Amino acid sequence: MIEMENIVVEDEATPQRRRIWLLLPLAAFLVLVALFYFRLGAGDPSRVPSALLNKPVPEFALPSMLGGQSVGLDSGDLSIGVHVVNVWASWCGPCRLEHPILMKLADDRRFEVVGINYKDVPENAERFLGALGNPFAKIGADRDGKTGINWGVYGVPETFVVKDGVIVHKFIGPLSEEGLAKDLMPAIEKALGATTATAQST
């Protein structure tokens, strides 16, 4: 009788052990996903790392988006000083939401705000700026999106901080007051501080 009971218990335990072994790979996968998620900034898409950080800006030369301007934007324009480069489009809803932040940034004369107009219709882009204001010192029209690809743009809007031709910071998604205060502005201040320190040492 005792032997039969032992056999029954053993038979019941075997499928349970099998289920545990089957679930182990899934559990390991979920752990890896969680680690990857937190390494990317606790799920904050604005903190996804860029392969171009601390590297020179990709070479580019874009025509002007605005009909009255003959000069667009090229990599040489970013070679000296601190620049905030915003990639935007008139068809981008979040770009409209972040636009007041860019207008505020444009008031700070310690750096220059420039724009890359991404895969847009020039007339629509001009209407967009006509309605909301133009924070950009220069704008280049990236009509085919190739420059955006070279910059590693995931989608619009995206904002880069460039110091002396080197990308030092990247913010993905629409800027907000919180994003400006906690992320972008500290990166700008750091770049400005590094520029000042370099100038003083020479």
Task: Describe these PLM feature segments.
Residues 192-202:
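Compositionally biased, proline/threonine/alanine/serine-rich low-complexity intrinsically disordered stretches
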Residues 96-133, 143-149, 182, 201-202:
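Structural microenvironment flanking redox-active thiols in thiol-disulfide oxidoreductases
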Residues 18-23, 29, 96-97, 153, ...:
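Hydrophobic alpha-helical transmembrane segments of integral membrane proteins
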Residues 130-135, 141-193:
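Thiol/disulfide oxidoreductase modules built on the thioredoxin-like
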Residues 84-85, 113, 159:
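Hydrophobic beta-strand anchors of alpha/beta hydrolase catalytic cores
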Residues 1-63, 202:
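N-terminal targeting signals for export/organelle localization
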Residues 86-91, 118:
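Aromatic-flanked redox-active Cys/Sec active sites in thiol-based oxidoreductases
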Residues 60-84:
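A short beta-strand-turn-helix
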